[in-house]
Amino acid sequence: MTTRIAVVNAGSSSLKLQILDGSQEVAALTLERWSADAAPEELEEFIDTAGELEAVGHRVVHGGSVHSGPVVLDDAVVDYLESLTDLAPLHQPKAVAAIRALRALLPEVPQVACFDTAFHSTIPAANATYAVPWEWTQRWGLRRYGFHGLSHAYASRRGAELAKRDVADARIVTCHLGAGASLCAVRDGASVDTTMGFTPLEGLVMATRSGSVDPTRIASEHAGSS
């Protein structure tokens, strides 16, 4: 007997859901211009026709310093995820809104969050630590969290499979290239470095994000020099 689950990906502007029966997709829904204000009727109708679900899995961009792996969602976890909004303002509010909407629609179904930051929890301190006063690091929890982790984890496994290599004994660079973009160095199946950092703004040039900018450039602008 297969397990029927819902998989939820709340992006910055859209909400995507899949119903999986085992590994087989049986239904899908994409809501463009997804708003965090209220659950749209289409979502309720989709869930009503999804059949009996055994679990719901949510992709969440930021797990903070607390969550380095999947976690069952309860009120305390949801509140903590909401507190991370400033670190991922385009994505975190939409993910939290989707979680709350699905928990309201399916109060008896266990729901789990899987984090884009979790894959990067293996980055060694030498690569994850910023060259700033240690007091800042401790006070604000500064570290290279990294993002797109679910994508990088899959790409590394799939890339190794296609190359007929064991991912646990391979060195791979993975690329997530969309409106947001990042690279990741994967060694023996674990993330050891990535281009994104404390927030999803750092690293490569992206569609609406500048990527890394020399901080002196900002100072010179304020000083009237260009």
Predicted segments with their positions:
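Short beta-strand-loop/turn "lid" adjacent to the catalytic site in phosphate-handling enzymes
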Residues: 48-95, 109-112, 118-130
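Short glycine-aspartate micro-motif
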Residues: 4-8, 55-57, 112, 172-176
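ATP-binding/phosphotransfer module of carbohydrate and carboxylate kinases, centering on a glycine-rich
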Residues: 222-226
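Conserved active-site "lid/cap" helical segment
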Residues: 32-54, 84, 98-100
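Glycine-rich phosphate-binding loop of actin/hexokinase-like ATP-binding domains
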Residues: 122-221
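A gly/proline- and charged-residue-enriched helix-loop-helix capping module
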Residues: 80-98, 139-153
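Non-transmembrane, aqueous-exposed alpha-helical and coiled segments at domain scale
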Residues: 3-4, 93-97, 106-108, 182
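Short glycine-rich, Thr/Ser-proximal phosphate-binding strand/loop in the N-terminal lobe
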Residues: 4-38, 197
